Amino acid sequence: TKEVFGCLASLVYAGLIFGYAMSIRYLKPINLNQTLVELNGVKSFIYVYSIVVATDLFAYFIGIKFGKHKLCPEISPKKSIEGSIAGSIAGVVVGTTTAFLMKIVNPEANEIFLTVLVVLGLSAFLSITVQIGDLIASKIKRGYQIKDFSNLFPGHGGILDRFDSLLYAGIWFYLIVQITELLLMGA
């Protein structure tokens, strides 16, 4: 029964998170606070994806080169605190830069300082969720005593590992946008 429950939980985890994350692509255009933030599906997806890629790449390469302190050795023995910090910093810098380059944020808005703080905070939060998603996928793999979810990308955790970070960060982004929109509509 434990195996059946674990299998069902994994399917629900992957299915729900994938559904929410892909819902980002179909977000209708949102103009929060009239001039500060303008979101749509494509811009939102690119914003989240840029954070995922930057976080994953910097965490991996800085962790390999400079990582001395293990982050969660029982779940993922190769991940380091140094890599995690570097990944988070890169995620914030790349995410914030992407938001401005794609004109998600209007740099000429009167309340630009507040907007920058919000984008920095959101980028930091999403970068952390990227790493949490990766750890959750690693925990699931450890629970089933498998190294890779598939052999499509040998040595790289398999097909789900290419998407776990994006899916986990995506669900949080989607929920934050939806809650923010509801709060602003009620204000």
Give the predicted meaning of each segment.
Residues G91-V92, R162, A169, Q178:
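Hydrophobic transmembrane alpha-helices of multi-pass small-molecule transporters
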Residues N31, P77, I104, G155, ...:
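Juxtamembrane helix-loop transition sites at the ends of transmembrane segments
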Residues V94-T98, W172-V177:
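Hydrophobic alpha-helical transmembrane segments that constitute the membrane-spanning cores
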Residues L175-A187:
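Juxtamembrane boundary at the C-terminal end of a transmembrane helix
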Residues S23-I24, G121, I128, G155-F163, ...:
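Short, highly charged low-complexity linear segments
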Residues T1-A124:
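Membrane-embedded alpha-helical bundles of polytopic integral membrane proteins
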Residues V52-K68, C72-P73, I81, I128-G170:
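Acidic (Asp/Glu-rich) catalytic motifs at the cytosolic membrane interface
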